[in-house]
């Protein structure tokens, strides 16, 4: 009813299934007129809906194919509009995209890449890299972050590309579990050598946290590898806290905390989460996003924001990690600001687990491993 009310009298709307609809919009003068029409439809869709005592605000995305430029047969036009819709959703900004010929090749590449990712996940061919973290006060080793890595066709696939692909195709859960298992195995290898890796951080997606059995899976993996729960840190982004089912996210995080696992909030300051989330959710550490660190020596705003985050976190009893630290000047600023831990190319790039283990041997020889057992 909302869609029909927003459209013109001669426009046609058909439900394709689920939450997808097709529109036939005759006699649209130009793209300006099209944009106005789609904005009117989007506004109608986004009117709040009361569901189970909660107010839901629906969002919308559009893909557009133009007759006869993008095809003359109905099936071709529908397919090309669907391709444009996929591109709109991939942008994560809503709105609309007009079909372009290059989109078809991009979709075909993405489909092939998705098939290869699924096969490599099943064959356990993905790997991890470990990036060291350093205690700012004394330069001691402070742990690692585990990062997913994938080589396809003899070349590395950029992590943002294949992680987003995994999210779009429902493979983020097995990908996340694979990374977690490899991270704990690497930690176990270091412990078996008598090294003190301190701990390891692993990124976790909302889809994983919403699985009822996720905390139990984490507990089973910790037990299998003989790793103390306190050595594992789960990293989540601010957007995870804004999920449509925050209650389930909260319960999962509480269960992980009950196991003794630590929780870090990644990319702090770049999302839309409010400060109330720091009170509601069981967080141990904040990670200052690299975008604030990059110019802290020259940009007074970035410097002020970074100092404020450190002060806020410490007032709440939270530790702070600065990401993307690349220069001695940045490190000096963070030290003066009271930041606890640093991570970035100044201390080491992400490296294979074996090389990370060798790094720990060198740190032990230099007296840069903490004395307390972790």
What are these regions (language model features)?
Residues 1-31, 54, 261-265, 318, ...:
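Conserved helix-loop-beta segment at the catalytic/binding core of cyclic-nucleotide signaling proteins
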Residues 3, 34, 38, 78, ...:
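Heptad-repeat coiled-coil signal-transmission/dimerization helices
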Residues 101-227, 239-241, 255, 268-270, ...:
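Bacterial c-di-GMP phosphodiesterase EAL domain
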Residues 1-12, 49-54, 91, 123, ...:
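Nucleotide second-messenger and two-component phosphorelay signaling modules
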């Amino acid at each position: 009813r909302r869609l029909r009310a927003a459209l013109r009298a001669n426009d046609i709307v058909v439900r394709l299934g689920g939450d997808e609809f097709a529109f036939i919009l005759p006699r649209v003068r130009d793209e300006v007129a099209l944009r106005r029409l789609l904005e009117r439809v989007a506004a109608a869709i986004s009117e709040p809906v009361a569901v189970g005592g909660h107010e839901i605000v629906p969002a919308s995305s559009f893909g557009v194919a133009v007759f006869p430029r993008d095809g003359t047969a109905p099936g071709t036009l529908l397919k090309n509009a669907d391709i444009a819709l996929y591109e709109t959703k991939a942008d994560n900004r809503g709105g609309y995209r007009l079909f372009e010929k290059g989109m078809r090749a991009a979709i075909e590449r993405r489909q092939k890449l998705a098939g290869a990712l699924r096969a490599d996940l099943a064959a356990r061919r993905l790997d991890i890299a470990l990036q060291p973290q350093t205690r700012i006060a004394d330069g001691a080793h402070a742990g690692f972050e585990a990062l997913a890595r994938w080589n396809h066709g003899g070349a590395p696939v950029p992590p943002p590309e294949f992680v987003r692909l995994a999210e779009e195709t429902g493979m983020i859960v097995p990908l996340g579990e694979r990374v977690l298992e490899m991270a704990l195995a690497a930690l176990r290898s270091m412990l078996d050598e008598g090294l003190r890796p301190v701990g390891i951080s692993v990124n976790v997606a909302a889809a994983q946290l919403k699985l009822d059995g996720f905390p139990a899976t984490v507990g089973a993996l910790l037990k299998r590898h003989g790793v103390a729960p306190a050595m594992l840190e789960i990293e989540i982004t601010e957007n995870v806290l804004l999920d449509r089912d925050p209650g389930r996210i909260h319960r999962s995080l509480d269960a992980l905390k009950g196991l003794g696992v630590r929780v870090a909030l990644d990319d702090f300051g770049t999302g839309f989460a409010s400060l109330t989330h720091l009170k509601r959710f069981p967080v141990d550490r904040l990670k200052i996003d690299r975008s604030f660190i990059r110019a802290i020596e020259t940009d007074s705003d970035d410097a002020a924001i970074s100092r404020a985050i450190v002060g806020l976190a410490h007032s709440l009893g939270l530790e702070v990690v600065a990401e993307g630290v690349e220069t001695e000047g940045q490190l000096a600023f963070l030290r003066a600001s009271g930041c606890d831990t640093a991570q970035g190319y100044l201390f080491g790039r992400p490296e294979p687990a074996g090389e990370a283990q060798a790094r720990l041997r060198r740190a032990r020889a230099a007296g840069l491993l903490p004395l307390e057992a972790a």
